[in-house]
Amino acid sequence: MSVARTSKRGKAVVLAGALAIAVAGLGVWLWAGNEGEAKPLSAPANPCWDGMPSQGSMQKLLGPGNKFFISKSPYRVIKDHWPSHCAYDAESDDRVELVLSMHLSWAGEPPKADDFQAAGALRGDKAKTFDAGVHAYYLKATNRLYFQCDVDQPKDAPEYIRNDKYVMVDVLAHPMDSAHLTAKQAREVGLDMVLEVAHKVADQAGCTNDTNLPKTAPQVADANWPRYH
């Protein structure tokens, strides 16, 4: 695994969990409302925000020729530190399936890598440690990443913004059957998306520290859930 930047000041932590709303102390995406109207899109779908995720990554989850419906909350995570949410539903035969769900928000501190509740891991599961201090729990289809982002805030910035030190990117990748992906391949696509988005947000936020974000995702040895549920 290669690393984009290295610094003792920067931290990047990857955590994966089963359900976003089950993570202790991180109910911020419960506020993410004001979602726009869902409308059909032709694959590859338009990105949720400015270039993220890439259409190429999205297409890997889809397989050929699927239609999409997108819902998203306003993209205010950079300026206002407001949680943002985006979801893609794909129309398959006679049903609509969730293909991708993404959340962006800020936090004062990330959960500890060995905290199974905060990480969404199961009791007894151990984090895998990679270069650059990246920790990952390979559980289900959610990939969650926290990275430190120091920003020169104006003196009149609200206290909650001044206290936010970490950006959280959460991606739930759920491939369609027509994509013909194995669980391991689905995990790899999800991790690639997390890093795509994290690098983009870091650039937009103007982090003054070295974020220590890897350029490429850690190698996936296995994935332990049936049919991505």
Place the predicted regions along the sequence by residue:
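Hydrophobic membrane-insertion alpha-helices, especially the h-region
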Residues: S2-A32
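A small/polar (G/S/T-enriched), proline-flanked helix-loop surface module common
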Residues: G36-H199, D203, D210-H229
